Amino acid sequence: MEKSGGRIVMDEIRSFEKAHLFDLGHPLLNRIADSFVKAAGVGALQAVSREAYFTVVDGAGFDSNNVGPPSEITGNKKHRFPNLRGESSKSLDALVKNTGKESLQWGLAAGLYSGITYGMTEVRGGAHDWRNSAVAGALTGAAMAMTTSERTSHEQVVQSALTGAAISTAANLLSSVF
């Protein structure tokens, strides 16, 4: 690969990071939509790659019981998408449905987090620090806990809020280190 070709590719990647995908007329809406679309794409890739992994593990005859978090029911394989086995249109429908659901969850989390941090920065007079990240992470974590399961307890919501705040704050503090 030539150096000039490498520079062109790197310039394209850098311009993608700075440019917004949408112009909806307000910076808040632009930021939320941009974050939603980018994270939804990541969520879709993650869901498809996870299913591809389980397909390879099952096809190769590996024991997938020892992969990932321990199963509550010992001896049974626990798959995220139990309907995705076999060569049928039902299997493809389940893959598309679950990939869409995962994309929506990732997109909502990113859009919510991005919108809250933008709003907090505006309200606090342009200050963007770990406090904004902690509040946005906590609210996003709590919201995601309430949307991922029908039987979510208040302990799970609080735990997700604390985890979201901790991860977001750590990422904000570490971003200044690197």
Swiss-Prot record:
Species, as recorded: Arabidopsis thaliana (Mouse-ear cress)
The keyword Membrane appears for this protein: yes
Complex formation: Homodimer and oligomers in membrane.
Keyword Chloroplast: yes
Induction summary: Regulated by ABI3 and ABI5.
Segments of this protein annotated with the region Contains beta strands: 1-102
Family that this chain belongs to: Belongs to the Tim17/Tim22/Tim23 family. Plastid outer envelope porin OEP16 (TC 1.B.30) subfamily.
Compartments, as annotated in UniProt: Plastid, Chloroplast outer membrane
Coiled coil stretches, renumbered: none
Keywords from the named record: Chloroplast, Ion transport, Membrane, Plastid, Plastid outer membrane, Porin, Transmembrane, Transmembrane beta strand, Transmembrane helix, Transport
GO MF, any single term: amino acid transmembrane transporter activity
Transmembrane segments: 103-119
Protein name: Outer envelope pore protein 16-2, chloroplastic
Pfam families xref list: Tim17
